[in-house]
């Protein structure tokens, strides 16, 4: 399982946007990935990949999706690992 190695706010550098509502107040961030319709979710304690659904209460009405971006969610996760922002649980 992947976990964040930095504060969730640091993920803004990679295009993550603060969640709306209570999730945002809790310091959670998300990034929608057009290729594969995935949503990357991060807080100070967890990193998760979910299917991107329009009525998700964490996502803003105008999601921060870059449709011209040709990366998949796995490409982005790889870049986050290389940037030392994500690591394995227990290490």
What residue spans do the PLM features occupy?
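Amphipathic alpha-helical segments
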Residues: 2-20
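Acidic, low-complexity, intrinsically disordered interaction modules
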Residues: 19-77
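Absolute N-terminal positional cue centered near the fourth residue
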Residues: 3-4, 42, 49, 88
């Amino acid at each position: 399982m992947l976990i964040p190695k930095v504060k969730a706010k640091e993920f803004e550098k990679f295009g993550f946007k603060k969640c709306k509502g209570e999730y945002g107040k809790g310091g959670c961030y998300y990034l929608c990935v057009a290729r594969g319709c995935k949503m990357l979710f991060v807080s100070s304690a967890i990193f998760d990949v979910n299917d991107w659904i329009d009525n998700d209460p964490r996502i803003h009405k105008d999601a921060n999706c870059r449709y011209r971006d040709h990366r998949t969610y796995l490409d982005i996760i790889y870049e986050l690992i290389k940037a030392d922002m994500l690591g394995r649980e227990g290490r």
